[in-house]
Amino acid sequence: MPSPTIGTSSADEAPGLEQGTMRRVTNRLMPFIMLCYFVAYLDRVNVGFASLQMNKALGFNAAAYGFGAGLFFLGYCTCEVPSNLMLYRFGARRWIARIMFTWGLCAAAMAFITGETSFYTVRTLLGMAEAGFQPGVLFFITLWFPEAYRGRVLAMFLASIPISGVIGAPISGLLLSLDGTLGLQGWQWLYLVEGAPAILLAPIVAIHLQDSPSQAGWLEDRQRDWLVTRMANEKRQIEGRRTYSILQALTNPAVLFLAAIYFTNVCLNNGIMFFLPQIIKGFGNSNTQTGLIAAIPAGVALIAVIWLGRRSDRRQERYGHAAVANLVGGGALLASALLQDPVARVAALALAYAGTISFSGVFWAIPGTFLSGVGAAGGIAAISAIGIIGGFTAPWFVGALKDMTGDFRWGLGAIGCLAIVAAAALYAFGRRRHAEVMTLVTEGTQR
């Protein structure tokens, strides 16, 4: 069920101009955006490594830890749509810089929590501060990259997640070894050191990014003119099918369905990430060994997200690729709950993590095929805000079942089953959407 190609232009007559323009845009924007998301994701999930010392030091059981870890997403979802609308109003450059500065402060403040109340409070504030960053960047990408390029570009952006695991997991393990240095515990050093980069990057964002291609002085005139024209043509074609206001986008059945699917993927992702260090350490590993082993699933995911994004672009198909990724993630997580051998369990968790991360790179190319302008800003934020509730639900659910049963298997197995059902639903939905689009194309041709 290939997605229809949108917005052909004069690039058909001058492929060198298109290739040169998109290469320059990609090289200018994506490495820096990836760096910012690397820092964001590290600050979001480093609580998993901090828990190896923090839980004992502050007296948290698995349910209290899972609840507090998940509160990040409750704060995130309450502020996500307003934050993305502010980005649309004030521009990505200024708003993303504001987001990074405030989340950096909150991430560093995690070093000074003293119990459950302060843990819950600061995690919620961290979520509120970071709200809007991911959907804001996703919206920013729709302003700079034609639809045909978004699968691979989004894969690059979301590759920051496994990169943060490959690099961040060993670093986090080593930071825990600073326990006692200057009177601070290892988990406190982890929060302080990993929170600082966001604060330092904030002013650079304000300088490095531009809000739209028309402001890109680093492009040649003909490149800038081509990109502005291409993006305007695509926007007109999308709006020619139907223009969505912010309210219509927020209540659109397709948006709500995609939000529900994203919810299952967020459950899958965070069910793995917040407890993976504890699972690995439970096999008898040290903190440093845990960090090194935890980098393995991230490395597998890095390969998967880039490969699937490129394949999706070549086929110009999104729904089926995303469905298969969620199916692989859910099936592998279920397998990890059934396996006994530690090596086999880590391998299954690596495959599950690869599925959940590669899903996102393809999935986020879907909303831009039927939303644009303020409708895209609101719709993307709504999908993210509703779906991100899974980030609150999954850690609490897995932690509570761990306290009840003494094992992580029950919670992880249940989340795996949920992801499998969602994969089937997404595939069926994609086939129906493709049929509807092809009907519109046929009717337009007949006219």
Which residues make up each language-model segment?
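Extracytoplasmic gate region of multi-pass secondary transporters
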Residues: 47-48, 247-305, 360, 364, ...
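Cytoplasmic helix-loop-helix junction between adjacent transmembrane helices
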Residues: 122-159
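Helix-to-loop junctions at the C-terminal end of transmembrane segments
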Residues: 79-92, 304-316, 402
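A late C-terminal transmembrane helix in Major Facilitator Superfamily
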Residues: 370-407
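Glycine-rich segments within core transmembrane alpha-helices of 12-TM secondary carriers
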Residues: 152-176, 197-198, 384-394
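Helix-breaking motifs and short loop linkers at transmembrane-helix boundaries and internal kinks
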Residues: 59, 91, 112-118, 129, ...
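Conserved MFS/SLC helix-loop-helix module at the cytosolic interface between two early adjacent transmembrane helices
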Residues: 78-117
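Structural signature of the two symmetry-related core transmembrane helices
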Residues: 94-108, 320-335
